[in-house]
Amino acid sequence: MPVTFTSSSHCTVKSGRWYSWYDGRTWTLASDVDIDDVVALKEAWDSGAKSWSATDRSRFHNDLGYAWTLDAVTDNVNSSKGDSDPAQWLPPLASARCAYATHWVAIKYRWRLSINPAEKTKLASILSGTCGAKTLAIPPRAR
């Protein structure tokens, strides 16, 4: 089902079909999904964005130039994540955790954001355990 909008400005979604890879659910009501900043804004702030210009913070929040930065996910799953990092929260679907950790690392690299010790430990555990041997294409730097 293609996404349709309420007007030509493409600001408000009327209908569509979205797959939430965090929990494996598919939705047809826009009200059932949120657009998730994979690295939440507060997490980015705490990891270095507090020293950025307002323009760079806006670019991060609206980063449409990199496919992994923003995702449509089930609304209550996104709410449960809040501003948590991977040491505090992982997708409920176990098979999504490797991709989530990979996306997290790539986004932090792209935006030159730091990773705290607990976050690093959890990411290393995920990426060296259940993920197996994966190659990550280094994303272009955003700043």
Where are these regions (language model features)?
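Aromatic-lined ligand-binding clefts that engage carbohydrates, nucleic acids, or primary amines
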Residues: M1-G24
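Domain-level detector of nuclease and nuclease-like folds
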Residues: W18-R143
